[in-house]
Amino acid sequence: MKIISGGVCAAKGFKASGVHCGIRKNRTKRDLALIYSEKVANAAAVYTTNLVKGAPLVVTKNHIADGKAQAVICNSGNANTCNANGVEIAERTSDLLASVLGIKPADIVVASTGVIGQPLNITPIASGIPALKAGLGDHSDQAAEAIMTTDTIPKEIAVSFEIGGVECKMGGIAKGSGMIHPNMATMLVFITTDCAISSEMLQKALSSDIAETFNMISIDGDTSTNDMVTVLANGLAGNKEISKEGDDFNEFMKALNTITVWLCRRIAADGEGATTVSYTHLTLPTKLEV
């Protein structure tokens, strides 16, 4: 396994873009991101444990209940949470994107991050979606920038690894610098891979990994409403699909863990007001004496 460039566009068949659509007042700040797979991918996700859940999360959870997705759209600057028409706006966002991309609305992950309780106007999103499509390319950096809120740096990484002698790639982007507390918190993480793995095993891998990565970091003790970690696997690497535990699954887990640990550390290092990052390594004794 080795670290490579490309972020979420490192894996075959994935493109990304990021634009300023007008949600944020600063015109130099991108505020709308898109990640797109040329074919429908298997998908897995984990979500915030906050009892109050943002409208985009509710919509996404419903969309990928079948373990499938083809695109991710995320806006920054407004969380679309605690709004009377929040679900309607999130669904409208996916409908507009689906129409432009020629895919199913149900195959779209919708995410938002930003101010809670402020109405989200669909107009800037509607005007920004065509630009997102036009800008699709190897632009993981644009997407990483567009999902930032109080972050000071974009966060992206990619790795290459082998499954059964076939080269596979995996990449991820993340946002988060405040309201970071165990059991998710204000974090959005989007991971892509061209490795062929069933949606069931993908979910198993993600759920297992999260317990030892994102659910272990804390910055300020606050848990947010919108946040999720999502993985899309389109299988374009051409390896034999991972459908059970074994050596191939273990190699996939190693790659996933490399991505998540790196992103976790970048989030912690970028914490609001953070000057020092602490890592604690515990070694349990092999034998206990009474």
Locations of regions flagged by a protein language model:
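Glycine-rich, mobile lid/loop segments that gate access to catalytic sites or pores
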Residues: 100-214, 224
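Channel- or pocket-lining gating/hinge segments that regulate access to a cavity or pore
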Residues: 193, 233-236
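Short, well-ordered amphipathic alpha-helical segments that serve as non-catalytic structural scaffolds
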Residues: 52-63, 88-100, 203-216, 255-264
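Conserved small/polar residues in nucleotide/adenosyl-binding loops
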Residues: 280-286
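N-terminal amphipathic/basic leader segments beginning at the initiator methionine
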Residues: 1-47
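Glycine- and Gly-Pro-enriched alpha-helical subdomains that act as flexible
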Residues: 215-218, 236-268
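Glycine- and acidic-rich phosphate- and metal-coordinating loops
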Residues: 70-77, 107-113, 227-233, 273-279
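Active-site-flanking structural segment that lines cofactor/substrate pockets
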Residues: 35-67
